[in-house]
Amino acid sequence: MRIPRLKLVEIMEVNGVKVFFHWSVLLIGALILLGAMEDPRIAFTVLAAYYGVILIHECGHMIAAQRKGCSVSSIVLYPIWGITCFSDPYSRYDHCVIAWGGVAAQAIVAVPLIAWVEIFGYTRFPPVNAALAILGFFSLSTGAFNLLPIRPLDGSIAWRLLPALLKRRPTRPIKREPAWRSWR
């Protein structure tokens, strides 16, 4: 799937893959920061953490796709979702693994942060607390939401993993020798 680059702003490169923002992300971010005159540090932290969650999710897809031998052309971040553009996977199983990659990446980041907050509590620094809440609790809840088996969410593909795993099993069981013969 090719995305027209006219309305995109390149922001970085991750593992050889260009990452773009849609222009609306910058506009919405600027409007939120303008409206947050009381404490712009918290507003900036929340925005950065929010788009960090989307980037972490898309990087999870990117890593899974690259591990499965797909070429990844770009990652595009929109105000409420992201898209990782990669070549067609070799199999249905590979496509399911790539779908799980985004949620797995979110969980790898979120679970330790949630454990930290549950064990030690929040800090006395409001911007750090905002980052912990977004990258931890919010990220895990959006990851769970993303696993709903509804298009266009990842769950519509990810939950096909079990049937794909069963299909990969050999049709005939491997023939084994009886245990009493194997001692020779």
Spans of model-derived segments:
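Hydrophobic transmembrane alpha-helices and their immediate loop junctions
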Residues: M1-R184
